[in-house]
């Protein structure tokens, strides 16, 4: 029987790159709240004592970049100068300018339905049936670990935790099915006065055990909890952070391909983001319909052109109908032009800051996670 291991990682909301993502999306949300048709490309850089917010925006809205930045950092938990990064004292630099009119003329149209793609590019969507949310298990549980770290930090269960943390989970598979967890890595920033023994016990009992299913843990499972022995210096003091540097964490943990475009800070006219959401919606509905156990869809676009330049689907030998039939069903039931997919998923609204930590996919409540097309797909496929 074929055996293999697969690993995915995640990072907490206090990781420097995720601070940057959340600030970029907080700015985007604030603008969309006033101007749903705004064009926004917001990038953020964080380092010890400073935040630089830049990019290109076309909007009728006015937002307070400094206040949005400080509020976001405060909510994450960087509120003391002894952390090296403090929401109330860090410098906030604003370098936002206007979007190029050359891009605008290629995107905007008299007929909104003919709105062109904001850039060229290729995007992937993926789903499989190894978890209830139709996501790969390694990234699902890697996210769950750092999400739990944040919860027990904020509610005071483990008061010595600090915001920066990373997780990594290695699953063992046999003939494509999960048979256990081979290794778990969890590194968390902490106060200087906590002992390694107390930290290991606290992390194991309040983070790892409540999150990971007991049936997948066994005597051979390996645990690496703060394996360097010390993680006091973290956040933007330890490393600079930049928007868009956690694209695999944001998506499928490496189990699906990635077109290379980041999500955070981009309004829905940017197909890097909106078409990746639509592709997830398509793949999830195909799997939910029982048309495949695994599904990866690729879409591609040309700048200024509404129709996708290509659609392709891979089901890895698990499809119940041909991939040609699936593509026909996708064209019939899903709108993949930029204006149409924005309307289909109701994307022109302030929903993005909440996506910017713990993954954009596999979290109920987002429109691209709905499986409302599954029954129609199944019926039209003749199953």
Curated annotation (Swiss-Prot):
Key words, A-Z: ATP-binding, Cytoplasm, Magnesium, Metal-binding, Nucleotide-binding, One-carbon metabolism, Potassium, Transferase
Enzyme class: transferase
Record keyword Chloroplast present: no
Reaction it catalyzes: L-methionine + ATP + H2O = S-adenosyl-L-methionine + phosphate + diphosphate
Alphabetical list of InterPro entries matching this protein: ADOMET_SYNTHASE_CS, S-AdoMet_synt_C, S-AdoMet_synt_central, S-AdoMet_synt_N, S-AdoMet_synthetase, S-AdoMet_synthetase_sfam
Binding-site residues for L-methionine, renumbered to this chain: 56, 99, 239, 270
GO biological process, one term: S-adenosylmethionine biosynthetic process
Protein residues bound to K(+): 43
Cofactor note: Binds 2 divalent ions per subunit. Binds 1 potassium ion per subunit.
GO cellular component: cytoplasm
Major subcellular site: cytoplasm
Annotated residues for binding of ATP: 15, 164-166, 230-231, 239, 245-246, 262, 266
A Pfam family: S-AdoMet_synt_N
Compartments, as annotated in UniProt: Cytoplasm
Classification via CDD domains: S-AdoMet_synt
Listed pathway(s): Amino-acid biosynthesis; S-adenosyl-L-methionine biosynthesis; S-adenosyl-L-methionine from L-methionine: step 1/1
Domain of life of the source: Bacteria
Subunit structure: Homotetramer; dimer of dimers.
Function in brief: Catalyzes the formation of S-adenosylmethionine (AdoMet) from methionine and ATP. The overall synthetic reaction is composed of two sequential steps, AdoMet formation and the subsequent tripolyphosphate hydrolysis which occurs prior to release of AdoMet from the enzyme.
Record-linked NCBIfam families: metK
Family: Belongs to the AdoMet synthase family.
HAMAP family: S_AdoMet_synth1
Protein name: S-adenosylmethionine synthase
Species name: Shewanella denitrificans (strain OS217 / ATCC BAA-1090 / DSM 15013)
